[in-house]
């Protein structure tokens, strides 16, 4: 794709924060990032992380990490650990200790009792289906629950018995008493507490009733002194409820909620439920599979924190919903790796070359720059009689415009000599297994006199090169809108069957043999690659393709 504008895109929240500070509303701004620990963070979360932590950094404020752990059945310590690691990897550090909504369960319970005593909450016996019927629709008002007019005393008694574990899951709930005729569905007597007999990763078995997200969120913000509670647009309709709770409870502060548009990328699924389905059903190797849209997946793919932060800055922050072209994210990593990744050569499909006129036993150590622009020093390649080129760089019957090696033709080996193909050796099945070539000793670093050699190909020495595994990753979905499936189908029907190709027996230049996990390179003519975080180790490298050198999808 064409190069996007790299200047910072508009951010209306930056302007709001600046105006609030200028007006003296807050001595210091405090933001928060409140993930639910029921899955790994994905690329959409990166936008929220960069926004909340970025605003706190820019305006010398604080940003809290708070786990919204109100649904113990779906939460796990594994997710908590992964979320903390992802935030740190992105380059951010939360202020103070990690917070948990469960830290405030006692206070939330006390406030629920205050609402009951004020006649603003009641215990309801309606089940989920009945409650849905009573709730009404967007065009029809709801109906009051038959239990709405219970006395304060009865509600206090029932709520205490709910807490004591007397009733089974789903038998009763505590609801706010607001307005069943409100055009805003969130104000139609929303649930404050549900019965869930589930072990909690932080509080153990202390509780069998758990507060709803809506009852927890604003009060947690108030307890922590959050000044700017920033959510995605789907929570805009929840703001009146957020404000109702703050107005009807003796909270220590009055935070303000703001909304921005969430990140939607084409060719990408970010639903935690669907990401979990991909993992559970074995369509990918795990939450950190390099094809996943999780931050741990992007990290293992070879994306850098800088590239993701830059991408989030490029797309900006606004309230307009839309779909961002994944090409912008791919541009961001290409741009960063082009400037920072050392160059190296790796032959993915090796074809042996014997240079018949090169002296046997002789080896020259050729110095090649590690980067064409930056001063990264040099790497040394031993050049001898035998080497490997890519099988795709020789054609007996070349197509039009082919500029690589052909019978009797010449090419330059990158950083080395010009060679000519003299003979192709084949096996019994007619497959080319070796090339016999000759070299021009006067062409090291210069063109031969009277001949113009157009093609340049990469190579590695036969002796000293390192055998490696290379994993060619591509987009997991072949459809720009993978959520859109044929009638009766699912998003799984849009999985790209060619999203992973594993190549073994590849040959890398000697300098790559000691690559450490997460070392990144540009393999010349092949793309940008990273030594795999889990499977690669010095002496037995495994490289993942991060991104191609150019946007090949845009040419289709």
UniProtKB/Swiss-Prot annotation:
A motif ('KMSKS' region) lies at residues 269-273. Its EC number is 6.1.1.18. A motif ('HIGH' region) lies at residues 35-45. Coiled coil: none annotated. Keywords: Aminoacyl-tRNA synthetase, ATP-binding, Cytoplasm, Ligase, Nucleotide-binding, Protein biosynthesis. Pfam families: tRNA-synt_1c, tRNA-synt_1c_C, tRNA-synt_1c_C2. Gene3D superfamilies: Glutamyl-trna Synthetase, Domain 2, Glutamyl-tRNA Synthetase, Domain 3, HUPs, Ribosomal Protein L25, Chain P. It is found in: Cytoplasm. Monomer. NCBIfam families: glnS, PRK14703.1. This is Glutamine--tRNA ligase. It comes from Pseudomonas aeruginosa (strain LESB58). The lineage of its organism: Bacteria, Pseudomonadati, Pseudomonadota, Gammaproteobacteria, Pseudomonadales. The gene is glnS.
